[in-house]
C-alpha cells in the first residue's frame, strides 16, 4: 500500500543530510578521520658477536712424539736433531686407553732389532701381544704412579719402545751410523667430557713422561745415566733403562713424596676456569738430607669448554749464564694444551714442547680414587661430593655440574639421539673417530672459526665431501700437525671400504654453533666386492643419512637476564608418516626458506618459538620451553590441522600430526649470542586428528638461530 507520508519523508531525509554536510554540521572529509596507520613489523639484524680466538691446538683424543735417532757419522754432519711441533702425531680414538695407540704401535712393530724383539712399555699399560711383548717390565722398569690417584679409566699416558737395530752403513750413500731405542711417548683418552664441575677447586694427580732431542756431546746426568749416549745419539726418555734417579724401585715412599717416578699435582679452579700445578720427580736418593722431590715445571692454563691451553714454566733453570744444568728442563713452553675426559671431567691428559725444542712432555692425571667401600672420595678443600653417584673428587659446591658443549647426531627416522665426541670446537665434526673440519682452509679465521656471512664472502651453508686418507705405512709421515687425523680404515673402522662423508653445514653467521646434514657413503673396492663381481657391483654405495648439531655452551655466569630477546635463524627437518609420504627441508637464509624465530625471556626462564617450512605461511612447529642454566627443554607440536607433507596432492593431502616432541637445546657463545636445539619424534600415532591417510607421524629436526637487534 502506497503511504504518501512515508514517501515524503524519504524524499526530505537525503536533502536534510546533504544540507547538514554543506552547513558544516557534518563532514565526509577523509583528512579529518582519526585512524592509526598500521605499524611496520620491526626490522632486525644479527648482533655483533666476538669471534672465537684462533686455537693453535685443535684438540683430539691424544698425541704421541717419536724418539729421535741422530746420524752420528762424522761426515754426515748431523750434530743435532731438535724436536718440532710437526712431530706430534694424533693417536686416534683408542679402543681401550690402557692399550698402546694402534697407529704408533704398528710403526714400532716393524722396527728391526739386533737381539730381542720385545716392545717394552710403561708397567701399568696393557702388555703388547707382540712376540714376547712387555717381557722385562719388572724391577728394571720404572714404577710410575701418584699415591691414591692410580685407577685410571679414561686417559692413559706412557712410553713404549724397542731396542732398535744398530745402523752402520759406510758403503752406500748417504752413509749413516745410528743406534739407540726407537719408540714413542704418548697420551690418549676416550669420552671427552660434556659436563664439568660448575665451581670449586678440584685436585688432579697423575704421571708425566718426557722425550729429549739429540745433540752431539749432550748428556743429562741428572736424570739419565748416559751409558748408551742417551741425549746424544738417541732421545733420552723417562722409560729409558738408564733412568736411575727417581724412586721407581722403592718399596715405600719417603715423607714428602707424592708417588713413584715422575708425577704431577694439578688444581683446577672451575669457577675461574684456571688450571695450575707442578711436575715433579720423586727422588731415589734422599739420604744426607737431600730433597725428597725435585720440581721441574709449573703449569698454568685457561680452561675453555673441555679443553685447556696455557704455558709450562721451567722451575730449575740455570741461574747464571755460565751455569749449566744436566737435565733438559731448562726452557719454558708456550704450547701447553690438553683436555678433560670422562662424563664429569674425572681425568685429563696434556702435552707440551719446550720453546727451545729440547724436550717434549705428555701426561695424564685424575681425581682421587674412590675408597674401597664405594663412598665418594673427598674433593679438594675437604668437602664430600654431594652429587649422588658422583665421580671421586669431581664434586663442586652442592655437586653441581655444568654442560660445556653439545654434540649430537640424529639419524633420519630413528628414535635415538646419539651423542658425538667433541673437543669444544663447533667447527670440527668428530664422527667414527675421525675429525672433519667444517670450514674451508681459506676461512678468514682458521678451521675453528666461522666466516661472517657476506663479510667473509662465504655462503650461508656449505656443502662438501670429506674422504679420510688411507692409513699410511709410516704413521709419523702420515700424520699432520695439530691433530688432523689421516687414518680411515684403522681409526674409522671402515673394514676395507672407502668411506666418504658428504656434509652440509649451517650457518656462516654462527661462530659457536654448527648444525647440518651428514651422509655416510661406503663403497667397496673390486677386491672387497669379490672376483666375480662387476665393477658396477663394486661401486655400490651404502648410504646413511643423519643430522648433527654441536655447539660451545655459554658459561652459566654469562647468561643474560633480559626479556623478549629475539633470535632468528633456520632449520633442517625430515617429517614423515608410515604411509611412505615424507617432507624434507634444508636450512636457508632465503625469505621463503626454512625459518626459525624465537623469543627468549631470560628473566622468566621461558623460550617460545616457531619453525616454518619453506614456502609456507603457517608455522610448521611451535616450540615452548623452560630455560635451565645454559640450556633449555620443551616441546614441539604441529598445528591442530597438521602439517601437509605433499602440497601437490590436492585430493587427499597426507598430513603429519605431532603434539609432544621433546625438544632439547642450549645457548652458545660468550654472551648467549646463539641458540640451537634438536628433537627426534619416534612416530607414535598420538592425536585424535590423525587420519588413516596420515598414519603414524615422525620428525627429525635440528635448528639454530642468532640473537637479533633492531635496525637503527
Curated annotation (Swiss-Prot):
Neisseria acquires iron by extracting it from serum transferrin (TF) in its human host. Acts as a TF receptor and is required for TF utilization. Involved in the initial capture of TF. Helps select only those TF molecules that can be used as an iron source and concentrates them on the cell surface, maintaining the iron-loaded status of the TF C-terminal lobe until its delivery to TbpA. It comes from the Bacteria. It is found in: Cell outer membrane; Cell surface. GO terms for biological process: cellular response to iron ion. Residues 556-712 are annotated as: C-terminal beta barrel domain. Residues 389-555 are annotated as: C-terminal handle domain. Residues 372-398, 446-459 have a biased composition (Low complexity). Belongs to the TbpB family. Isotype II subfamily. InterPro entries: OMP/PagP_b-brl, TbpB_B_D, TbpB_C-lobe, TbpB_C-lobe_sf, TbpB_N-lobe, TbpB_N-lobe_sf. Residues 59-196 are annotated as: N-terminal handle domain. A lipid is attached at residue 21 (S-diacylglycerol cysteine). Keywords: Cell outer membrane, Lipoprotein, Membrane, Palmitate, Receptor, Signal, Virulence. Pfam families: TbpB_A, TbpB_B_D, TbpB_C. A lipid is attached at residue 21 (N-palmitoyl cysteine). It is a lipid-anchor. Gene3D superfamilies: 2.40.128.240, 2.40.128.250, 2.40.160.90. Changing residue 218 to E: Decreased binding to human transferrin (TF). Residues 78-104, 123-144, 223-256, 309-338, 364-398, 442-495, 689-712 are annotated as: Disordered. Has 2 lobes, each of which has an 8-strand beta barrel flanked on their N-terminus by a 4-strand handle domain. Electron microscopy suggests that in the TbpA-TbpB-TF complex, TF is captured directly above the loop domain of TbpA in a chamber of about 1000 Angstroms(3) formed by the 3 proteins, where interactions between the proteins serve to abstract iron 2 from TF. Changing residue 225 to E: No longer binds TF. Residues 95-104, 462-475 have a biased composition (Basic and acidic residues). Residues 197-367 are annotated as: N-terminal beta barrel domain. N.meningitidis cells will only bind to human TF, not bovine or porcine TF, explaining at least in part the bacteria's inability to cause infection in non-human hosts. Binds only human holo-transferrin (TF), via the TF C-terminus. Forms a large complex with TF and TbpA. Interacts via its C-terminal domain with Slam1. Residues 1-20 form the signal peptide. This is Transferrin-binding protein B.
Amino acid at each position: 500500500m502506497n503511504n504518501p507520508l512515508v514517501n515524503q519523508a524519504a524524499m526530505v531525509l537525503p536533502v536534510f543530510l546533504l544540507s547538514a554536510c554543506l552547513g558544516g554540521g557534518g563532514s565526509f572529509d577523509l583528512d579529518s578521520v582519526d585512524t592509526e596507520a598500521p605499524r611496520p613489523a620491526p626490522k632486525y639484524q644479527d648482533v655483533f658477536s666476538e669471534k672465537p680466538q684462533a686455537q693453535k691446538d685443535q684438540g683430539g683424543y691424544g698425541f704421541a712424539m717419536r724418539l729421535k735417532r741422530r746420524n752420528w757419522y762424522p761426515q754426515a754432519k748431523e750434530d743435532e736433531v731438535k724436536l718440532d711441533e710437526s712431530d706430534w702425531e694424533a693417536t686416534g680414538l683408542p679402543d681401550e686407553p690402557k692399550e698402546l695407540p694402534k697407529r704408533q704401535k704398528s710403526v714400532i712393530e716393524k722396527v728391526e732389532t739386533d737381539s730381542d724383539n720385545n716392545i717394552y712399555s710403561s708397567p701399568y699399560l696393557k702388555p703388547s701381544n707382540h712376540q714376547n711383548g712387555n717381557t722385562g717390565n719388572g724391577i728394571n722398569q720404572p714404577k710410575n704412579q701418584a699415591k691414591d690417584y692410580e685407577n685410571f679409566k679414561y686417559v692413559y699416558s706412557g712410553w713404549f719402545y724397542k731396542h732398535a737395530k744398530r745402523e752402520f752403513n759406510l758403503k752406500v750413500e748417504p752413509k749413516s751410523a745410528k743406534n739407540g731405542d726407537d719408540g714413542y711417548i704418548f697420551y690418549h683418552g676416550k669420552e671427552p667430557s660434556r659436563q664439568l664441575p660448575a665451581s670449586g677447586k678440584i685436585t688432579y694427580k697423575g704421571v708425566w713422561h718426557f722425550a729429549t732431542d739429540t745433540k752431539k756431546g749432550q748428556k743429562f746426568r741428572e736424570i739419565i745415566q748416559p751409558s748408551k749416549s742417551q741425549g746424544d745419539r738417541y732421545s733420552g726418555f723417562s722409560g729409558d733403562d738408564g733412568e736411575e734417579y727417581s724412586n721407581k724401585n722403592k718399596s715405600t715412599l719417603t715423607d714428602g713424596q707424592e708417588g713413584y717416578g715422575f708425577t704431577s699435582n694439578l688444581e683446577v679452579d672451575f669457577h675461574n676456569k684456571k688450571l695450575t700445578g707442578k711436575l715433579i720427580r720423586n727422588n731415589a736418593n734422599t739420604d744426607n738430607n737431600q730433597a725428597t722431590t725435585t720440581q721441574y715445571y709449573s703449569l698454568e692454563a685457561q680452561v675453555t669448554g673441555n679443553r685447556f691451553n696455557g704455558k709450562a714454566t721451567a722451575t730449575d733453570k740455570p741461574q747464571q749464564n755460565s751455569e749449566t744444568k744436566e737435565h733438559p728442563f731448562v726452557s719454558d713452553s708456550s704450547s701447553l694444551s690438553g683436555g678433560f675426559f670422562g662424563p664429569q671431567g674425572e681425568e685429563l691428559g696434556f702435552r707440551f714442547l719446550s720453546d727451545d725444542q729440547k724436550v717434549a712432555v705428555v701426561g695424564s692425571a685424575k681425581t682421587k680414587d674412590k675408597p674401597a667401600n664405594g663412598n665418594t672420595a673427598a674433593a679438594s678443600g675437604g668437602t664430600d661430593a654431594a652429587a649422588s653417584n658422583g665421580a671421586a673428587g669431581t664434586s663442586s659446591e652442592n655437586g653441581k655440574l655444568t654442560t660445556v658443549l653439545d654434540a649430537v647426531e640424529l639419524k633420519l627416522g630413528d628414535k635415538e639421539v646419539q651423542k658425538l665426541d667433541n673437543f669444544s670446537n663447533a667447527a670440527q665434526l668428530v664422527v667414527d673417530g675421525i675429525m672433519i673440519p667444517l670450514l674451508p682452509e681459506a676461512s678468514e679465521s682458521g678451521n675453528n672459526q666461522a666466516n661472517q656471512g657476506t663479510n667473509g664472502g662465504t655462503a650461508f651453508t656449505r656443502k662438501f665431501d670429506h674422504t679420510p686418507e688411507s692409513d699410511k705405512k709410516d704413521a709419523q709421515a702420515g700424520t699432520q700437525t695439530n691433530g688432523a687425523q689421516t687414518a680411515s680404515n684403522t681409526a674409522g673402522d671402515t673394514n676395507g671400504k672407502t668411506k666418504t662423508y658428504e656434509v652440509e653445514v649451517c650457518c656462516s653467521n654462527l661462530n659457536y654453533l654448527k648444525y647440518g646434514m651428514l651422509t655416510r657413503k661406503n663403497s667397496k673396492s673390486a677386491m672387497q666386492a669379490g672376483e666375480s663381481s662387476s665393477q658396477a657391483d663394486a661401486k655400490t654405495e651404502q648410504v646413511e643419512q643423519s643430522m648433527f648439531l654441536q655447539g660451545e655452551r655459554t658459561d652459566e655466569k654469562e647468561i643474560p637476564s633480559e626479556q623478549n630477546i629475539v633470535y632468528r635463524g633456520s632449520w633442517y627437518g625430515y617429517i614423515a608418516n608410515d604411509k611412505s609420504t615424507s617432507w624434507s627441508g634444508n636450512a636457508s637464509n632465503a625469505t621463503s626458506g626454512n625459518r626459525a624465530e624465537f623469543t627468549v625471556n631470560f628473566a622468566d626462564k621461558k623460550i617460545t618459538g616457531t619453525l616454518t617450512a619453506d614456502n609456507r605461511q603457517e608455522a610448521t612447529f611451535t616450540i615452548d620451553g623452560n630455560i635451565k642454566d645454559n640450556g633449555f627443554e620443551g616441546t614441539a607440536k604441529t598445528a591442530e590441522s597438521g602439517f601437509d607433507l605433499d602440497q601437490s596432492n590436492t585430493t587427499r593431502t597426507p598430513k603429519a600430526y605431532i603434539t609432544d616432541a621433546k625438544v632439547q637445546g642450549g645457548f652458545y657463545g660468550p654472551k648467549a649470542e646463539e641458540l640451537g636445539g634438536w628433537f627426534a619424534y619416534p612416530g607414535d600415532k598420538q592425536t585424535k586428528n590423525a587420519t588413516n591417510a596420515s598414519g603414524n607421524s615422525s620428525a627429525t629436526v635440528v635448528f639454530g638461530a642468532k640473537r637479533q637487534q633492531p635496525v637503527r
